[in-house]
């Protein structure tokens, strides 16, 4: 009973010492007392189990300075005072720390177009640029001139049909706008033209001609029957478009109708020229 009680007591003391942090200081003292008891011839009588338990409890009970109240019972599972007090860990305010600049991110999607702004002020005139190279030659422009003057040296008499007066003498025919074979002037330059017709009448015969525009009778040249021949003329201005035709027509022979001329002299003339081009203001 004595050795078993001592074992239980020793285990109880070790638990109390571990809990209170005094195990290292108390274990050698207990071992020394046991050696003294073993060296004596007569061992003291072991105290009662209850008394020894109270004595050990009083010896190893934590003092009031350690923070436990006197009225509180200490159990073997209660935590004791820590042998190594925790040190305060310094705190770092990460909001004041600035890290290194990161890599550039990927390009984002294009945003929507904003509202159109107001027009800015007119800028300053820039410096004069260098002279450019010469361009390619352009197309040849059309001539803005037209003129003709023709004559006839042969007399002409009417018959049962209308006759175009054909001229055999060319005085002026700029750019060949007057066709000597057909006896007609062809308009290649649109604009305002002046025309003049001069004839010599025949004695005792009527003179009856028209200046024609395309197939339209425009003006008449007329002379009644007379004992003497005379020079008769007619003139006018016409506005022509391209491809219009102007010519002279002898009236058909309801009555005897004729114009006089001879090989030695020119008695019949027809002239015309451009006064104003159509594109001119």
From Swiss-Prot:
One of its GO terms (cellular component) is extracellular space. SMART domains: C1Q. Glycans are attached at residue 93. Residues 141-281 form the C1q domain. Residues 48-62, 100-109 have a biased composition (Basic and acidic residues). Its main location: secreted. Residues 34-68, 100-138 are annotated as: Disordered. Keywords: Collagen, Glycoprotein, Secreted, Signal. GO terms for molecular function: collagen binding; identical protein binding. GO terms for biological process: negative regulation of platelet activation; negative regulation of platelet aggregation; positive regulation of aldosterone secretion; positive regulation of cytosolic calcium ion concentration; positive regulation of gene expression; positive regulation of MAPK cascade; positive regulation of phosphatidylinositol 3-kinase/protein kinase B signal transduction; regulation of glucose metabolic process. It is found in: Secreted. The keyword Secreted applies. This is Complement C1q tumor necrosis factor-related protein 1. It comes from Homo sapiens. The gene is C1QTNF1.
């Amino acid at each position: 009973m004595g050795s078993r009680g001592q074992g239980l007591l020793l285990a109880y003391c070790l638990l109390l010492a571990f809990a209170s942090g005094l195990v290292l200081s108390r274990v050698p003292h207990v071992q020394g007392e046991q050696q003294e008891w073993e060296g004596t011839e007569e061992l003291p009588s072991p105290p009662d189990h209850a008394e020894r338990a109270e004595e050990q409890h009083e010896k190893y009970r934590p003092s009031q300075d350690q923070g436990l109240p006197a009225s509180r019972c200490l159990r073997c599972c209660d935590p004791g005072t820590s042998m190594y007090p925790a040190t305060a860990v310094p705190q770092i305010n990460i909001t004041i720390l600035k890290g290194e600049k990161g890599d550039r991110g990927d390009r984002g999607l294009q945003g929507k177009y904003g509202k159109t702004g107001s027009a800015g002020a007119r800028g300053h005139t820039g410096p004069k640029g260098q002279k450019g190279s010469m361009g390619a030659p352009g197309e040849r422009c059309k001539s803005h001139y037209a003129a003709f003057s023709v004559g006839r040296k042969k007399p002409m008499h009417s018959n049962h049909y209308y006759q175009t007066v054909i001229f055999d003498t060319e005085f002026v025919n700029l750019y060949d706008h007057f066709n000597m074979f057909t006896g007609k002037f062809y308009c290649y330059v649109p604009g305002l033209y002046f025309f003049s017709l001069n004839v010599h009448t025949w004695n005792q015969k009527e003179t009856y001609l028209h200046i024609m525009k395309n197939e339209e009778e425009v003006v008449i040249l007329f002379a009644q029957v007379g004992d003497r021949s005379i020079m008769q003329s007619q003139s006018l201005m016409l506005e022509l478009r391209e491809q219009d035709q102007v010519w002279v027509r002898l009236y058909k022979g309801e009555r005897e109708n004729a114009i006089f001329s001879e090989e030695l002299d020119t008695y019949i003339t027809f002239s015309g020229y451009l006064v104003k081009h159509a594109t001119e203001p």
